[in-house]
Amino acid sequence: MLIKKPADIRTSEITSQDNYLNRRAFIRAGSIAGASMLAGPAFSAMVPDKRRAKLAGVSSSDFSTDEAANSYEDITTYNNYYEFGTAKDDPYHNATDFESRPWSVTVDGHADKTGTFHFEDFIKPFDLEERIYRMRCVEAWSMVIPWVGISLADVVKHYQPTSQAKYVAFETLHDPVRMSGQRRRVLDWPYREGLTIAEATNPLAILAVGVYGETLPNQNGAPIRLVVPWKYGFKGIKGIVRISFVDKKPRTSWNMATPREYGFYANVNPEVSHPRWSQARERRIGAGLFTPKQATLMYNGYGEQVAHLYDGLDLHKNF
C-alpha cells in the first residue's frame, strides 16, 4: 500500500544546538540566579560532553514533521530512562560517565542471518537519515526531536526473518554497576519491548543513533535506541543490546509491571485515557508555563502512515 508522507521541514528552520547553547550562555551570564529559580534544572550549565561527534553522510527525510524542534537542552535534560534514575534530570546527571563504547548488538531468533555484531558493523550497511518526529510521552507531555537513525525496516530485511517470525523483541543492556537505576527493582530488568513485524517494517520506525546531527547522548539511549513516533515514548527502548525475531508476542517491561495501565501496542490515542489521567491533551516541553495544553492527535498525527496496521483491532481493548 502507498505510504503518504508528511510535509518536509528544512534543517535551516531548526534552531541549531550551537546557536541555542550560545544564547543560553548569554542569558545565564546576565541572570542565572533569577532564571534558575524560575525554570529549575533546565537552566543549569550543561556539562560539555567530549564524546559528542558529528555524524557524516546524514540525508534529510520526507517523513519529517513541519513543526519546530525542541532545543538540544530540552531533549537532553528532560528524559525518562529509569536505568539511570526516575527523576526527569536523573539520566542527564547519572549517565555522564557511562561508556557506550565498545558496544555490541546480538540478533537472534527466527532469521536467516543471526550473530553478535560490533555497533559500528551493525549500522554500517544502512543509510543515516534525519527524522524530525513528534514524541508523545504516556505522561501527557511531548517534544519534537530531530533524530538521526537507520530504517528499522531495512534492518529487518537485512537479517531475513523467516515466516515463523511474527514479532520483533528488543532488550536493553543489564549492568547495575554502570546503570545505577537498575540497582532498584523499579522494573523487572533488563528493559524489554516489542513490535509486530508489520510495525517494525513500517517506514516510520527507526533505530536512532543520533540527535541534532551528532551521536546520541547517553541520557537519550546511546548508542542505539528505538523510535516509533506513533506510539507512547516508553516503547522507545534505549541502549539496545539484543534484537530477536520471535513467533509469540514478547513480554514488555511496563506491561509486565502494570498491565492495567500499559498495553503492548501503546499507540497514542486521545480517546483512551490512562487509568489515572486523560490522554486527550498534552503539554509541549519548552512552550512556557502559561502556554495552554494542546490537543493530542490520534497516532500522534501519523495516522495516514500507520492506521492500516490496526484495521479490525479494538483499540480500547488493545491499548
Regions found by a protein language model. Give the residues of each.
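Structured, non-membrane catalytic/scaffold regions adjacent to prosthetic-group chemistry
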Residues: 46-319
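N-terminal secretory signal peptides
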Residues: 1-21, 25, 34-35, 40
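Boundary at the C-terminal end of the N-terminal hydrophobic targeting segment
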Residues: 42-44
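Short, locally clustered residues in the helix-turn-helix/winged-helix DNA-binding domain
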Residues: 31
